[in-house]
């Protein structure tokens, strides 16, 4: 047994104990934390590794949904001052960057993803002075800021659109996609959020239709227009000049269109991404954006969505193409279904993406965000018995995979789905419009509500559960959306006091990843790949091999890692009771949702 505790879900396999001791002794991270856990480094970076010094490769990103994080002024809506008041909490997690959902001025049809003014702050959130204070507070604490850039579409209340729809001869007309009605009805395009799923909306003012892939209040911008592109680059420079550290390009894979609008085959809606993503001159626009803005500032860039193939994703983030830095692919998070999911499929998807990016490009690793229901409710088990171990197990997965981890606010507590049973309690435009569509077409509303309870985006947007006081300490007013009813038992204040809570386990995982570069750059190898219950893999780098074993089920499960365990050193376990020591036998039995 080592003279200092190693903290990792798995076993220390390769390299000698003396090697680990020597590396710990020589590490600049050697020291002690308040809970008596040693800090050290396994696998010092070889000379010249990550020589480009890109901070985002070793970053750990914490996503803050501002509307639901912390309300300062008592109006029931989270705001920038509320975030400022909780920066010390965020810093205490050990994360290194914050991704902030849109705070721009917006009529709020889609919770800020319908922007009416890209250079001003939504009044619900505060003022530009508040933003400047927030940014300074983050930088003072060593935290970087990544902002959402929503430029596939704008709000229909943006001045660009007001001018565009005013006249067919308006200089802003081509900022958007229009189809004149005398040409007949435009070829059908599917809308994700429209009540009728029709992406063309007729506008009588100029007797024409405008295109909206999302809600009818989110008209799509026409990136073929040079003047529009320059407007966007100027907006990016405005924020980069303020000192932000990165942009996440929301839905940008859909920005380029074939503006001849050919007819698509019947049923294309079921695979609309193949027809919408990575079309036209998208790469040309990104290369121009890089040349005009990204290359001139010390900012990172991440693409929401990664096209329809590994080649698409590589083309977005291949450094030699001078486009973006990081891919944010949804294949993994899209696996979860109300009836469950196959771990074999889960392993296959994440292994494929890791293999594809092992030597080229850079990936994000995540299982939840503002567009998903809660992590533990979708991929784990949110029952009282298994919520804590399964939430910890899933956190272990995210923090031990290759790529930049993104963690959504509240998931560090193991917050669960709210599971509202009345449509009136849902605020999401997509949920409300789809409910109305089901009602209009005679759909099964009972079944639809069950699907919402499992998968609605609003499950991930309920207020952050700070404590067990009124409104979970989120607001002194009436929250904009109902709280999850279990906030009295699942909250940050309670977990701060418990060294074995989800929150404190998350902090240990974050610190470990930061201190051990094998978890950032190490080779990933899938083990026991046909095991339907356990995800087993190694991370290997610079003479160090770490084994991670994750039971994804509510029953005990056995795994054969395919290697002798006699000399393995246990590092971390997500259970409150310690795991039994490994035996010389290859097979290892894991408790329900155990990470060991």
Regions found by a protein language model. Give the residues of each.
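Classical eukaryotic N-terminal signal peptides for Sec-dependent ER targeting/secretion
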Residues: 1-3
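Bacterial N-terminal signal peptides
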Residues: 5-15
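Active-site and adjacent substrate-binding regions of carbohydrate-active enzymes
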Residues: 21-596
């Amino acid at each position: 047994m080592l003279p200092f505790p190693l903290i990792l879900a798995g076993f220390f396999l390769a390299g000698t104990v003396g090697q680990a001791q020597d590396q710990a002794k020589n590490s600049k991270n050697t020291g002690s934390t308040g809970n008596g856990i040693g800090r050290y480094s396994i696998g010092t970076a070889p000379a010249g590794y990550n020589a480009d010094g890109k901070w985002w490769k070793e970053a750990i990103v914490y996503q803050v949904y501002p509307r639901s994080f912390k309300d300062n002024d008592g109006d029931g809506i989270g705001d920038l001052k509320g975030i400022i008041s909780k920066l010390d909490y965020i810093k205490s997690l050990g994360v290194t960057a914050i991704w902030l959902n849109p705070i721009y001025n917006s009529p709020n049809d889609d919770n800020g993803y319908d922007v009416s003014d890209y250079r001003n702050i939504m009044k619900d959130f505060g003022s530009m002075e508040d933003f400047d204070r927030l940014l300074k507070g983050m930088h003072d604490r060593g935290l970087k800021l990544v902002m959402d850039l929503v430029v596939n579409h704008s709000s229909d209340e943006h001045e660009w659109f007001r001018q565009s729809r005013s006249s067919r001869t308006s200089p802003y007309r081509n900022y958007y996609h229009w189809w004149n009605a005398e040409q007949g009805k435009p070829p059908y395009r599917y809308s994700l959020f429209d009540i009728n799923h029709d992406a063309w909306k007729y506008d009588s003012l100029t007797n024409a239709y405008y295109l909206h892939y999302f809600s009818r209040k989110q008209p799509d911008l026409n990136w073929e227009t040079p003047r529009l592109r320059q407007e966007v680059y100027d907006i990016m420079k405005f924020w980069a000049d303020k000192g932000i550290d990165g942009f996440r390009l929301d839905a940008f894979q859909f920005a380029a269109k074939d503006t001849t609008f050919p007819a698509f085959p019947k049923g294309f809606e079921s695979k609309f991404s193949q027809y919408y993503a990575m079309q036209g001159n998208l790469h040309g626009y990104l290369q121009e954006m890089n040349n005009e803005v990204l290359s001139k500032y010390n900012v990172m860039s991440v693409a929401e969505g990664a096209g329809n193939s590994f080649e698409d994703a590589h083309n977005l983030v291949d450094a030699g193409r001078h486009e973006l830095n990081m891919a944010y692919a949804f294949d993994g998070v899209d696996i979860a279904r109300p009836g469950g999911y196959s771990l074999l499929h889960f392993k296959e998807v994440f292994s494929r993406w890791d293999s594809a990016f092992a030597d080229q490009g850079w990936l994000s690793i995540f299982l939840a965000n503002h567009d998903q229901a809660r992590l533990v409710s979708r991929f784990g088990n949110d029952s009282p018995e298994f919520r804590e171990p399964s939430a910890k197990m899933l956190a272990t997965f995210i923090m031990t995979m290759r790529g930049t981890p993104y963690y959504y606010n509240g998931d560090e507590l193991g917050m669960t789905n709210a599971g509202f049973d009345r449509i009136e309690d849902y605020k999401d435009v997509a949920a409300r419009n789809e409910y109305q569509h089901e009602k209009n077409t005679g759909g099964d509303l009972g079944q639809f509500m069950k699907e919402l309870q499992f998968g609605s985006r609003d499950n991930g947007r309920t207020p952050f559960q700070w404590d067990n006081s009124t409104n979970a300490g989120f607001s002194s007013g009436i929250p904009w959306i109902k709280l999850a009813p279990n906030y009295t038992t699942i909250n940050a204040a309670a977990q701060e006091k418990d060294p074995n809570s989800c929150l404190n386990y998350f902090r240990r995982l974050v610190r470990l990843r930061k201190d051990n570069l094998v978890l950032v750059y190490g080779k990933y190898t899938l083990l026991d790949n046909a095991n339907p219950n356990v995800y087993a893999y190694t991370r290997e780098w610079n003479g160090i091999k770490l084994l991670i074993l994750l039971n994804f089920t509510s029953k005990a499960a056995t795994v054969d890692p395919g290697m002798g365990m006699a000399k393995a050193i246990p590092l971390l376990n997500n259970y409150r009771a310690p795991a039994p020591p490994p035996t010389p036998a290859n097979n290892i039995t894991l408790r329900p949702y155990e990470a060991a």
